[in-house]
Amino acid sequence: MKRLHWIWLLSLVFANPDGWGADALQARQWCVSALTYTANRDVADPFDFERADFSAIFHGPAGAEWKVPGFWDGGRTWRIRFTPTAPGRWHYETRFSDAGEKGLHGQVGTIDVQPPLTDTPLHQHGGLLQVSSNHRYLTYSDGTPFFWLGDTWWAAPSANVPLDVFKQQVDVRLAQGYTVFQMHGHRPLTDSETIGAFEATRHADAATLRYWQQVDRYLAYAEARGMVGCIGFARGDMFDPISLTDLQRLWRYYLARYGAYPVLFLITQEYNIEPDKRQQYLPKMLALGQFIKDTDPYRRALTAHPWARSRDLGQAWNEPWLDFIMFQAGHRRFEKPSAYHEVWQQPSPKPFIEGEANYEGFAATNFNVNAAAIRRSAYTALQSGSFGFTYGAQGLYAGVFDHAKPGPTFRWGPVLTWKEGLALPGGAQLQHLRVCYESVDWWKLEPRPKALEPSADVLVKADGAATLLLYYVSKVKLPPGCHLKDLPDGQAYAATWFDPRTGGTTKLPDGCVVKTEKLPLPAPPDTQDWMLILRKLGSK
């Protein structure tokens, strides 16, 4: 197993205010660091963040200032995890609600932060993702465009997705170019345990501590390997009996414990599901979104996972805390490009991501989600404005171990295990999607739904007249005279066919030339789906 890279995690134990050494600590930009303290006495309820509020104020180069929440980690041990956002010298001072608790309050220190590592993009550019200045995509912490290619492991972390399985999933998907995993694990981590996330901020006991320290190992592994987690808890209607205070208690602890990691938050799966229950829980969900945004010291991009598009009323879309829109096209159907265009054309744009569409292996009498369906769903979303795509697979999304114990997956078609879902061809073929888009400046591309005349089942995305990507759906029939319109007369383009199944490319030897502001569309190599990449050549 590859050695974990978070060697910059600092562990300093303070039994009293005189425990400081004279030398500055060492850390790395964009890597998780941790400070460890020992309280002078037991805290009755360490999850009560109003009466036991532990934090540190960090001051860094160029006036940087971060207030980072801390967390209880067993007995009298408390920690603060922090990701330095710039190289140079940082100073910090701790705060605790009870200023008389000198083991936790008023501790000061210095950290010398070295430039970032380059072993993974997350360590090089920072995994606390932000919204781009034009509100069309997400960026790494340093502003570098972030390409979202995600997989769905809703059951992680839990007994359905034990740590060794999680590691296999991370390793396979990273090798295929994936950058994100989505999960809403809230269940116990073994069959013998009774504590999951919702129970894990109620009592400061050994079972609770064991739960959190096991979850640590999941997120530490993903961070070390270079994969972003997009995380929530359960499903919206399951929050009905839980008070907003208890939800805030859970999220305050979660943010303190994992906020320094390269993670995003989707709050829950399907935050606005079930209209007959919605009024009982939806106001809590929206208020919780603002609480998460206000508590997160890094103000990272925040979203909420919605119900299927045909039933999604977009209640969170205009909330000030919602930074990007997560879309759910749903299953066993193809979403129309116009549905994505509507989101793209919002008066006050927010980036949007297709977060759940056609899990591979789902099947019905008239619709089989195979690799071709996966490609069509993914390329349609990106060509229509989504800044990425999240894949999902039967069995894998729910952590199925045994065909005889399928859980809810039996409703969606033939039962698969997580390992069978991980090996499906559509998931592997999406590595080529990322290669395709990263072969150009993908973040400069915009959907062009009216670029063709007459219209055809070819989706166009373009950077003005400089670079154009044309996705031909399978079995497309080009009408006579179909062309790209409104291009510079006489302009020549290098033209390349990109095969979404293999990643192979074939250049058109004569390229394409605009005549009378029209560029005739070439026919695809065969009846399967293809991407045509056009790159402007020199001066016309």
Predicted regions located by residue number:
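Bacterial N-terminal signal peptides
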Residues: 5-15
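Non-catalytic, glycine-rich low-complexity segments
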Residues: 20-62, 68-70, 110-117, 126, ...
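Aromatic- and carboxylate-lined catalytic core of secreted/periplasmic carbohydrate-active enzymes
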Residues: 23-27, 42-47, 359-362, 372-509, ...
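Short tyrosine-centred short linear motifs in exposed loops/low-complexity segments
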Residues: 28-31, 76-78, 82-100, 476-480, ...
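Active-site mouth of glycoside hydrolases
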Residues: 53, 116, 122-335
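Surface-exposed loop/edge segments in extracytoplasmic proteins
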Residues: 62-69, 502-510
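Extended acidic/polar, glycine-enriched regions
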Residues: 66-133
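Catalytic-core region of carbohydrate-active enzymes that cleave or remodel glycosidic bonds
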Residues: 319-403
